[in-house]
Amino acid sequence: HSLIIDGVFAGVGSVLSFLPIIVTLFFFLSILEDTGYMARVAFVMDKLLRKIGLSGRSFVPMLIGFGCSVPAIMATRTLVSDRDRKMTILLTPYMSCSAKIPIYAVFCAAFFKKYQALVMIGLYITGIVLGIIIALILKNTAFRGKPVPFVMELPNYRLPSAKSVGLLLWDKAKDFIQRAFTVIFFATIIIWFLETFDAKLNVVKDSSDSLLALIGQAISPIFKPLGFADWRVTTSLISGFTAKEAVVSTMAVLMNTSTANLGTALSGAFSTLSALSFLVFTLLYTPCVAAVATIKRELDSRIQTVGVVIMQCMVAWLCGCAVYQIGALL
């Protein structure tokens, strides 16, 4: 009973409640794809992207990255240059994917009620700016050289077909729903198990005595400079490795509340400043397991993949720490 109600329903249900927002995002991306506009945007952006060491072709994968990192990384296969392809793969995860929207929505509603839209837009801009900075660093270090000339056949403009848009939309939304009932489903069960039992596999009455608490408490000091050291918060970040949507569902399970009341529960674990630091960290830290697996497949190198994960975690920690520490001084 506890597994079904407190684990599965609380976890998967809280994630599915954000499906309308995510479907809306995918709907507009699908329209842009079907009209032939994407290719023209790539052509227009070529001159600008060359300043940071990329070609216009890199723009399309990074734009898709705002929907999901997995198809975005796979889309880099269309890039002719191996240099451009690898560089685009490294930068794409900095484009905030739709799976992070539930996290932004919950925290913005709880801590930035008057400025929800501004904070969310600010997060997206932060990701883009960080991506540009990282690109400039890579351009002058590991990826010296010039991007290949831009050559692309531009398709004719056309009115979007309802059938084509519907198929594109379903393909993208289906992936989100499948993850909710597979990756997030199993992640929720694992989190429930770790929260319910202690090291001796005895059922605990207080979740602070659970296996999950031990893991969260072990890593929580790392996040103290960022303003959040609550084991429930750090544990939710661990679950975020399985799927970013799982961060919200894990918090809902650990705080024994529903998504609707999660904002109230979060006020006891965060200040406004630490909430902003958490959002910045969540924006920038390593993408989900599916995206990491795709990076491994495209780069064909475990060492480079591990390097990408470590680099993103370090960038996220440094930026989150800067936000909290500088904010505390003001």
Predicted regions mapped to residue ranges:
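Extended, low-charge hydrophobic alpha-helical regions
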Residues: 1-8, 12, 52, 73-85, ...
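Conserved phosphate-handling catalytic cores of large alpha/beta enzymes
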Residues: 71-149, 252
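Juxtamembrane inter-helical linkers in multi-pass membrane proteins
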Residues: 39-69, 144-168, 212-214, 256-257
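Alpha-helical transmembrane segments of polytopic integral membrane proteins
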Residues: 21-29, 34, 38-42, 69-76, ...
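Transmembrane helix-loop junctions at the membrane interface of multipass transporters and ion channels
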Residues: 98-121, 290-301, 322-330
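Selected transmembrane alpha-helices and immediately adjacent juxtamembrane segments
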Residues: 1-31, 118-233, 237, 306-330
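Membrane-water interface of transmembrane alpha-helices in multipass transporters/channels
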Residues: 37-42, 55-57, 84-87, 114-125, ...
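Juxtamembrane helix-loop transition segments at the membrane interface in multi-pass membrane proteins
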Residues: 32-51, 75-92, 139-157, 293-305
